[in-house]
Amino acid sequence: MPKAKTHSGASKRFRRTGTGKIVRQKANRRHLLEHKPTKRTRRLDGRTTVSAADNSRINKLLNG
């Protein structure tokens, strides 16, 4: 049986930390920012961890 491949789209969107958590970028901060409040764009800045409900699914995509 051939080796399972890592999902290339998931590998671009998710990163694993040293402790094993999976982090992602927040959505809604790519374009059309001029009508979004500055408070909202600041809140959407940075990374956040993946929710526990999605953790196992993303693990399968990343591990192949």
UniProtKB/Swiss-Prot annotation:
Entry annotated with the keyword Ribosomal protein: yes
Entries under InterPro entries matching the protein: Ribosomal_bL35, Ribosomal_bL35-like, Ribosomal_bL35_CS, Ribosomal_bL35_sf
Regions of compositional bias (Polar residues) in chain numbering: 48-58
Gene Ontology MF terms: structural constituent of ribosome
Biased composition (Basic residues): 1-42
Keyword annotations from UniProtKB, A to Z: Ribonucleoprotein, Ribosomal protein
GO BP annotations listed: translation
Source taxon at top rank: Bacteria
Membrane-crossing segments per the record: none
Disordered: region residues: 1-64
GO annotations of cellular component type: cytosolic large ribosomal subunit
Pfam families assigned to the protein according to its UniProt record, in alphabetical order: Ribosomal_L35p (PF01632)
HAMAP family named among the record's database cross-references: Ribosomal_bL35
Record-linked NCBIfam families: rpmI_bact
Similarity remark: Belongs to the bacterial ribosomal protein bL35 family.
Listed PANTHER family: 54S RIBOSOMAL PROTEIN BL35M, LARGE RIBOSOMAL SUBUNIT PROTEIN BL35M
Protein name: Large ribosomal subunit protein bL35
Record organism: Mycolicibacterium smegmatis (strain ATCC 700084 / mc(2)155)
Taxonomic lineage: Bacteria, Bacillati, Actinomycetota, Actinomycetes, Mycobacteriales
Gene: rpmI
